């Protein structure tokens, strides 16, 4: 998957004037130009620096708790760190954002902001159903898998709220194919982009090794 793969979610033909509509894409691409092991080691070396942040802790609905790098996401921006793989990732995100924006709107985007953080998860951790934004200026969000072992990120239709989260998790773990969600296997080097309002969660991390991802928000300017 060296090219961008677009997974399209669109409503069926409306039978009622009050039926909901949706039309969005989940975009994915495998990046072979990032050394994930080197990046993993670098991020782990920065963990204590991030943990030194003690104010404004908020895990943003992920369920990971305040003793995490995730809960400090509002107090640091990973893309200000000068490291070769992060610098490459910034360029790849910019390229993918431009491609996505052009595909959906037919126009180029001239400028956008980028803020990111790292999620370092231990055995037994799971990111709960949440989204990143739904305001009138919300734009795109994404994640990059640095190191993972048999986990999935699941992107849920924002109108599909009839199924409880624990049921959804079991459906995904049992391999149930349901059109209300898209289950994406977390592969080292995978970059994913999606509208910020899309609810998403992960399956449980069952490995003794860390699960490490970089999550980010793009700001429309």
Regions found by a protein language model. Name each.
Residues 72, 77-152:
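Conserved double-stranded beta-helix
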Residues 23-25, 140, 210-214:
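Short beta-strand micro-motifs in enzyme catalytic cores
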Residues 199-213:
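Ligand-binding loop in jelly-roll beta-barrel domains
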Residues 2-105:
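Non-heme Fe(II)/2-oxoglutarate
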Residues 154, 217-221:
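Double-stranded beta-helix
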Residues 119-193, 210:
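Catalytic core of non-heme Fe(II) oxygenases with the double-stranded beta-helix
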Residues 18-22, 115, 153:
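N-terminal cap/leader regions of alpha/beta-hydrolase-fold enzymes
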